[in-house]
Amino acid sequence: MQIEEIQNYPANLPVLVEDELFLYPFMITPIFINDSSNMKALDLAIKNDSMLFVAPSKLENGRNFDEIYNCGVIGTIMRKVPLPDGRVKILFQGYAKGKIIEQISNKPLEAKIELIKEDFLEGTKKEALLEVLKEKVKNLANISHYFSPDLLRTIEEGFDASRICDLILNTVRIKKQVAYEFFVLTDLEQKLVKLIDLIAQEIEANKIQKEIKNKVHSRIDKVNKEYFLKEQLRQIQKELGSDTQKEDEVREYQKRLELKKKFMHEDAYKEIKKQIEKFERIHQDNSEASMIQTYIETALDIPFEKISKKKLDIKEVSKQLNHDHYALNKPKERIEEYFAVRELLEKRKIAEKDGAKVILCLYGPPGVGKTSLANSVSKALKRELIRIALGGLEDVNELRGHRRTYIGAMPGRITQGLIEAKQINPVIVLDEIDKLNRSFRGDPSAVLLEILDPEQNSKFRDYYLNFNIDLSKVIFIATANDISNIPAPLRDRMEFIELSSYTPSEKFHIMKKYLIPDELKKHGLKSNELSIDDETIELIISDYTRESGVRNLRRKVAELCRKSAKKLLLENIKKVIINTKNLNEFLDKKVFEIEKNNGENQVGQVNGLAWTSVGGDVLKVEAVKIKGKGELTLTGSLGDVMKESARIAFSMIKVLIDEGKIKIPKKIIIDPKVNVYDSYNIHIHVPDGATPKDGPSAGITISTAIASIFSDKKVKADVAMTGEIDLKGKVLPIGGLKEKLIAAYKADIKTALIPRKNYERDLKDIPSEVRDNMEIIAVDTFSDVLEYTLV
């Protein structure tokens, strides 16, 4: 069949299937045939002396019409060569694109083929698109190996847009489906635009591939260089003998581990041994080597084998507590009881987990001696004291340790404390346990449950170490300011010992016996170089500090010592004498001063007693009546609970007025037809308005102030009171009684009214100097209060 016969289409042609490529017209392509279907199609074409239609397959080895594309190339067989392996090689030259319009036969494949004719494109648009395409191909050729110089020259010199497209598509690597889409596209303008876009994508892809290859080659070169340098360094170290350093370290670690073996859990021994073996195998230049070495040294620093051999001795503990602390009789007594039990358990070889399970928690205001009591215990037992501050702690890993997968991982504070103490049975103070925070990082109180529980703490697991540590020999003492903030499960496992405020007398003795000698020593002064008389000490306590403890008092003593030291050196004198007359030369002006009772009885002004975080205080409550409609106004930064107490008090007073238990003078009555309390607005004020105040204990104080203004009777100025009130006039118990009565004593109050339940329950805890110098009266109802207060 001659090429001129290509015009006699549609025509029936044998169909040969090509698995690998899309063939294009005007190209000579070798095709290898090794299956019977293609062999039969080839034989049919040769037999009929006809052209052959070559179609690409959709699926590998697809030989049915539904497994091949319906388009392909019409061409002739230029040569047929049998191969030794049984295959046949032919050279195929394509002439035109065609598509299957009718299936004639399946064995062999034969179909009616129709020519694919592309649209005609001429003019400037064709020239412009060809120029852009040729430029893109040139750019792609510069960064890839797709185009040979001859092919690139053919494309640059060509003018047949359709043929140039076929040459490019035959050269670049594209998927069969993409090639098919180009093959059947007859709009030449659209084909050029689409091909330009394809070449642009290929350019970008090749740039990225080239960049990645360059980086990979650069990295490989760097790695090879590092390896070469490390090998050189290793040989140098070997010549210098430094290569043996690691071997010495490994031997030292193994020796230390064997010495500690019988004192640690089996899992601890296995884990440390495993890490030593890993460290021995790993190259010292490996980044993991330093992490493993840090772990080994940390684990071996834990003092498994070191334990204080000092036996528990209750007499030593008692002696030390009394030597270091004045007063605090109840806390000291309870601590002595705790260690008496531990001593018996130890002597009779009873495991603590089988005995009394108690964790002591010392609570009270700042500066009252919570931590110093624990310090005295550690001295008596000859054990190290480790303080772990829990204030603001919200990450459980701070206690349990960080897993070694994290950068900067370290053991928890408990483990660090043992390492710092250099003994496995120190005294650990868990300071400010009431200030733990719960967050998304976990609940530290849950970890503390495990640490403090005798049934669990013998196998406490630190995440960093990944083995168990025995904490059963550690003495834990917790401290807190407000036990209501401690989580309930943790609170349930503790026994609380309250350290309440010091009285002025106790502070006087503490300052004279402990603070002044201690600060003199710290400031390099001798006892005969500074003199402070008793009256001055009392003045400093009452007017220069205001706290439950003695921390600020110590600061004042330190200030006196500093200024005395300066005075001794500058003025060349032998002794500094501080008294009430020259005290203001050494300390600033008075900061605190409890308002003394002035002895003037007034209507509507009552002395209340309040509790604050720094001790007790005398709180004035003032009330006035103004013509109005029975409204109640409250000022003085009062909290919700205190406001409710005022409303309860007002309602209770109304009932007493209606019942005739509070007599109203005629001069106060505005309209006999209207209740007197509906004729006035009541304004209650608590001075020092910038300070927030709250709580129910001012109930009887507010009630007395209202009763005073309606009865027009004065309130005794030397009487103070505290107690909650209910609507029936019953006086209910309150808290903080000791601090409140101490404040009343400081203010020269002669009589204090307190709820009867507090009188029966708490009076024994009130210092004798307060009880002996002030009349303390128990009240049951508000009628009792009026009996002792109104003049």
From Swiss-Prot:
Transmembrane segments: none annotated. Its main location: cytoplasm. It is an enzyme of class 3 (hydrolase). The keyword Cytoplasm applies. Keywords: ATP-binding, Cytoplasm, Hydrolase, Nucleotide-binding, Protease, Serine protease, Stress response. One of its GO terms (biological process) is protein quality control for misfolded or incompletely synthesized proteins. GO terms for cellular component: cytoplasm. It catalyses: Hydrolysis of proteins in presence of ATP. Residues 600-791 form the Lon proteolytic domain. Its EC number is 3.4.21.53. The active site is at 697, 740. GO terms for molecular function: ATP binding; ATP hydrolysis activity; ATP-dependent peptidase activity; sequence-specific DNA binding; serine-type endopeptidase activity. ATP binds at residues 364-371. Induction: By heat shock. It is found in: Cytoplasm. Residues 13-203 form the Lon N-terminal domain. The keyword Chloroplast does not apply. ATP-dependent serine protease that mediates the selective degradation of mutant and abnormal proteins as well as certain short-lived regulatory proteins. Required for cellular homeostasis and for survival from DNA damage and developmental changes induced by stress. Degrades polypeptides processively to yield small peptide fragments that are 5 to 10 amino acids long. Binds to DNA in a double-stranded, site-specific manner. Homohexamer. Organized in a ring with a central cavity. NCBIfam families: lon. Belongs to the peptidase S16 family. HAMAP family: lon_bact. PANTHER family: ATP DEPENDENT LON PROTEASE FAMILY MEMBER. This is Lon protease. It comes from Campylobacter jejuni subsp. jejuni serotype O:2 (strain ATCC 700819 / NCTC 11168). The lineage of its organism: Bacteria, Pseudomonadati, Campylobacterota, Epsilonproteobacteria, Campylobacterales.
